[in-house]
């Protein structure tokens, strides 16, 4: 009787983790007690799997570490229990049949029970296979050991599955949090784009309203004047018809001719079906462009300009700005960039070309370009150029020339990729073009292709991917819209940033990465 009670007490003070009597027991808020070492190991396991909350290994109720308390009462019970030993009589009762009082010496295979010889002869066990305990103990010890090892293996698998699901849970949470952040950022960008598009569209409508109403007001004034003139003429005729014969005939031919030659002037009208139709912006495309710009901006480098000996180009002290200066003695230049197709000569020092070469562009000046001081020989590089308020410029990259104080760029300019120039340009305020290789008939004259640029850029971004052999130009003013991209560039030499303010005195400025 007493032994049964002691067994029950022992079960109550046994650690559910190590299955031994509690050592330095600690109580959780849920009521379960564990060894101090076991609960410490449980904490480390929770940290290993990045669990946000710790939970009881028995009931899985979460708890905070500061709520754990030492259980002095249970510790005292364990100490007393370790001192208690079963008396010989009580130990003897454990080995005797509770029903017959005989020694428990046999094992019933069918019922898997330890029995006495009287139990073997009872109706309950008649016909069953029974063995002496000594005969089967070793066999079942091996089976139990095998089962224990199998169970421990399954426990490891179960713990791994538990850890895997916790890891997957944490991974999903991280992924969803990341997606939520991206969604919020994307919609914020879309809102900015929509606000910009709305403001731009409203400005266009206000401009249209101003132009149309101004024209209609002018027409209205003209119609009022025309009506007033008609009234005065009608009044004159009525007065003549009602007056004397002399008044009737005085200057009658002149007034009749005025009436006969009179033509009603019709007001200028605007057809509503000819108005510009508003179209909602392609938000996905704009967002994709914005993402591409965000990606290339990660490679922003701080570019400064190299010194030069060109009298036409003035570089500021901070080496970020270049502007055109009209010298007293102008260079005898061939003229503007996109003139009519007539013969001209310009200087070029590109290998393989002559010092004076004839082409079919007119009035184009090559002698105001400057290079960046940093060479590009590998990797990805990005920079931005402020071209606001300029009516003409050329920018991009130039290959093969080391810039220094003695470098004369005007002797080395021929804007074709085969000669190491990957550039785009602007002239006359709104005409954008890209410079391509000239034809076989005009190998030293670049082939100039017009570009469609809806919104004129105040800033142009230039991105060079040396390994991919590409040069890209972005319209920063229009959400990073791709203006043009050179592919399969032959970067056999180092390349340098290139800026040409042309004959426009407004400066070009290299923007700092922090701008």
UniProtKB/Swiss-Prot annotation:
InterPro entries attached to this UniProt entry: B30.2/SPRY, B30.2/SPRY_sf, Butyrophylin_SPRY, ConA-like_dom_sf, SPRY_dom, TRIM/RBCC, Znf-RING_euk, Znf_B-box
Matching PROSITE patterns: B302_SPRY (PS50188), ZF_BBOX (PS50119), ZF_RING_1 (PS00518), ZF_RING_2 (PS50089)
Pathway as given in its UniProt record: Protein modification; protein ubiquitination
Keywords: Acetylation, Antiviral defense, Autophagy, Coiled coil, Cytoplasm, Immunity, Innate immunity, Metal-binding, Nucleus, Phosphoprotein, Transferase, Ubl conjugation, Ubl conjugation pathway, Zinc, Zinc-finger
Coiled-coil residue spans: 137-225
EC number(s) from the headed UniProt entry: 2.3.2.27
Cross-referenced Gene3D superfamilies: 2.60.120.920, Classic Zinc Finger, Zinc/RING finger domain, C3HC4 (zinc finger)
Zn finger (RING-type) start-end: 15-60
Residues carrying N-acetylalanine: 2
Class of this enzyme: transferase
Modified residues (Phosphoserine): 87
Quaternary structure (record): Can form homodimers and homotrimers. In addition to lower-order dimerization, also exhibits a higher-order multimerization and both low- and high-order multimerizations are essential for its restriction activity. Interacts with BTBD1 and BTBD2. Interacts with PSMC4, PSMC5, PSMD7 and HSPA8/HSC70. Interacts (via B30.2/SPRY domain) with HSPA1A/B. Interacts with PSMC2, MAP3K7/TAK1, TAB2 and TAB3. Interacts with SQSTM1. Interacts with TRIM6 and TRIM34. Interacts with ULK1 (phosphorylated form), GABARAP, GABARAPL1, GABARAPL2, MAP1LC3A, MAP1LC3C and BECN1.
Comment on protein domains: The B box-type zinc finger domain and the coiled-coil domain contribute to the higher and low order multimerization respectively which is essential for restriction activity. The coiled coil domain is important for higher order multimerization by promoting the initial dimerization. The B30.2/SPRY domain acts as a capsid recognition domain. Polymorphisms in this domain explain the observed species-specific differences among orthologs.
Function: Capsid-specific restriction factor that prevents infection from non-host-adapted retroviruses. Blocks viral replication early in the life cycle, after viral entry but before reverse transcription. In addition to acting as a capsid-specific restriction factor, also acts as a pattern recognition receptor that activates innate immune signaling in response to the retroviral capsid lattice.
Protein name: Tripartite motif-containing protein 5
